[in-house]
Amino acid sequence: MEVFAPVVFEAYRQVEWPAEGSLLLDHLPFRTRAFADGRRIPAGRVAFDVFCAVGYLAGKPRLWRAEAFSSAHPANWSAFLGSLPGEPKRIVCEAHKGMLQAIGARWAQVELHRCEWHLQHALERLLAKEIRNNPSDELQELRARAEGALVGPAFWGQFARVARTARNESLDRWIAVNAPVIEAQFARRGPSWRRPPDMPLTTAALEQITRPIITALYPRRYALRNRQRLNRLLMLLQLHANGHDDVHAYARAIRFQLEANAGRPLERRRAIADPAGSPSLR
């Protein structure tokens, strides 16, 4: 797999970021058990992240790039965004600080659209927490309204007016931070019937496309310690996600390379091995 994955992937490799439509960005954290002071950490720790980008071809979402990193640090996001030339016109993503920092540094002029599902989910989580801590009729009403708060400007305006009467410090702070983003997005997104398929409001298409990656890697997460090897596995998973996994095409590509190189692959497995005791993803 690690020797021939780049060979079969080459014909489908994207050579630049999409210049039209939207680029959806997110990361998939893979957690393992962890302990501190002899006690288990409930959520474990992130062993590695898989950064994913989805672009659009003829109005249909395609997994553009997938790459594993040891963490979601801004420097790793910068490396991911810099792995291809070009600049997208529009990015849809959640509010991950490392990602946003890297986007701002590399593509300062890009139209940045915060995923509206993640915004609404964050709002609903906040309200649920506040209701547990301090139940009130006002917060219960706001929780009921939150489900449709981001449908459009009118719904958001009604929600914001009711929120002001609740006088909840955490909610007021959330609205102060996020209202400018939400209202700016309302101003430029236009009516739904005029919105083309490659201008989504959420990262739902990315989540759907990358679900098989999670399914494939999660049971193996403890064994995945070599970054280069994992990235070559991700090449095959990308081909599968985009419907390009053809065993006959694979065989032709491998045979062509072997025939051109006296029956030997261009690389050896040892070339991507980690130094003993120094895994690249831990």
Where are these regions (language model features)?
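RNase H-like nuclease fold core
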Residues: 2-93, 97, 101, 181, ...
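Short hydrophobic/aromatic residue motifs in ordered secondary structure
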Residues: 29, 121, 207-211
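Short, solvent-exposed polar/charged micro-motifs at secondary-structure junctions
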Residues: 32-37, 124-126, 233
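Short, function-defining helix-loop hinge/capping sites that tune catalysis or transport
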Residues: 34, 102, 126, 215-216
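A broad structural signal for alpha-helix termini and local helix breaks/kinks
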Residues: 84-85, 107, 217
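Acidic/histidine-rich catalytic cores and adjacent linkers
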Residues: 89-93, 97-101, 139-282
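Conserved beta-strand -> loop -> alpha-helix junction used to position metal-binding or nucleic-acid-contacting
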Residues: 90-139
